[in-house]
């Protein structure tokens, strides 16, 4: 595959945009421009049976309605339903960057053992939404805790064959409201699959902060559970290492001890 977009125009669905949204935000989705090599799969969480029109005039769009809530559940449906060779996860307020997507697809084609790519996102002003590494990195349990779903592109069949799914006990809409992306990457790596970070911009997303995950006891409890899920019996020591980094940034001793105890 070359960088020329026309090389993708083969009639095969190469890329799936896997959107996850709530019913009340369904009509707010920023849809990518129609292309012959892509499909747009929209998973709508509609537990209250909100009356919405799920029909689309575009042939490249498919909509799946869920009568349940939870972003991890909707991502798993997207994995099971995707027709593309690759899939990038999407939220309703994301705008994708064509050049970055093509570069990621080229990387997948050149590296057939790569199962997941983690890229970058920028805000509406073009500024990086977080601190990103400047060079390519192989992902591990130790460097992927800050991954975001909309930064992730997967090789669909490899993920399905390995039986990797998002843990539905974590993520927005679940009691443990964060960490689903980190757990997904960790499970992938534990199974011996390859995941790479690339310093390429995949999408634009508004610079909306969900708050400091060290702020409340609930935040600390959930974050502790994430590390327990990823590291098992070694989570206690990982939490100590994290606290050592966070105390100089303002984490109180009492909250540090609460987090360490899990």
For each feature predicted by the language model, list its residue ranges.
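N-proximal low-complexity "stem/linker" segments adjacent to membrane-targeting elements
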Residues: 1-39, 52
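The conserved acidic donor/metal-binding loop of glycosyltransferases
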Residues: 91-95
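Active-site donor/metal-binding and catalytic loop motifs
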Residues: 172-176, 194-214, 223-226
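Conserved donor NDP-sugar-binding/catalytic core segment of glycosyltransferases
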Residues: 99-132
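Glycine-rich, basic loop-to-helix element that forms the pyrophosphate-binding segment
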Residues: 66-82
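Catalytic core of nucleotide-sugar-dependent glycosyltransferases
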Residues: 212-237, 259-262
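Short aromatic/hydrophobic "clamp" motif used to bind/position activated sugar donors
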Residues: 87
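A short, conserved alpha-helix in the catalytic core of glycosyltransferases
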Residues: 152, 158-159, 169-198
């Amino acid at each position: 595959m070359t960088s020329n977009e026309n090389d993708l125009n083969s009639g095969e669905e190469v890329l799936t945009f896997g959107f996850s949204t709530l019913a009340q935000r369904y009509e707010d989705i920023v849809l990518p421009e129609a292309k012959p090599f892509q499909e747009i799969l929209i998973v709508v969480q509609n537990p209250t049976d909100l009356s919405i029109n799920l029909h689309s005039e575009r042939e490249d769009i498919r909509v799946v309605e869920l009568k349940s809530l939870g972003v991890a559940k909707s991502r798993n449906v997207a994995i099971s339903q995707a027709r593309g060779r690759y899939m990038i996860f999407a939220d309703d307020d994301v705008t994708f960057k064509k050049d970055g997507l093509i570069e990621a697809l080229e990387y997948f084609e050149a590296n057939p053992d790569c199962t997941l790519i983690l890229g970058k996102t920028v805000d509406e002003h073009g500024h990086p939404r977080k601190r990103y590494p400047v060079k390519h990195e192989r992902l591990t349990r130790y460097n992927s805790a800050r991954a975001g779903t909309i930064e992730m592109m997967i090789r669909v069949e490899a993920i399905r064959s390995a039986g990797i799914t998002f843990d539905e006990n974590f993520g927005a809409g679940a009691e443990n409201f964060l960490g689903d992306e980190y757990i997904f990457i960790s499970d992938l790596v534990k199974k011996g699959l390859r995941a790479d970070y690339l310093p390429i911009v995949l999408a634009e997303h508004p610079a909306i902060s969900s708050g400091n995950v060290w702020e409340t006891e609930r935040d600390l409890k959930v974050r502790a559970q994430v590390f327990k899920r990823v590291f098992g019996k070694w989570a206690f020591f990982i939490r100590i290492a994290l606290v050592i980094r966070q105390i100089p940034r303002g984490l109180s001793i009492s909250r540090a001890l609460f987090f360490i105890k899990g």
